[in-house]
Amino acid sequence: MGVASQSSVANEAGAAPEASIQQTLRGFSSPTSLLLRIATAVLCTLTLAFLVTSKERKEIASIDIVAIWSNSKALIFLAVVSGICLGYSLLHAAVFLVMLSGNRNPLARKKALDWMVFLADQIFCWFSIRVSNAGFV
């Protein structure tokens, strides 16, 4: 009975957990990721455009009342988070395009950078969920 190598143990167990993690992290630098970043940037831009331009005018007892988005702290929080997410999405898309246009392959990035992207995505997801709940508090 000899000593089994790590690759043979990984092959017997199916797939090594490290390989699965690497495949997941490589998804953050795929062309689909670029399209999702652009879609996120478009949606954040639309959110900011609707917030800035929306006004509601109502006349109550011959008094003209104008409601604007800056009167609500939840909507201000939504505008700030949308602006930050817009900047992050554009930055990530620009980094991907620079890596794609240069000699570097965007799929051959460092694992630490992929973990940073994953962490930042999780933080922005948490902020987005928090924004959606801010209006109900």
Curated annotation (Swiss-Prot):
It is found in: Cell membrane. Its main location: membrane. The keyword Oxidoreductase does not apply. The keyword Membrane applies. Residues 1-31, 97-116 are cytoplasmic. One of its GO terms (cellular component) is plasma membrane. The chain crosses the membrane at residues 32-52, 76-96, 117-137. It comes from the Eukaryota. Homodimer and heterodimers. Belongs to the Casparian strip membrane proteins (CASP) family. This is CASP-like protein SELMODRAFT_431320. The lineage of its organism: Eukaryota, Viridiplantae, Streptophyta, Embryophyta, Tracheophyta.
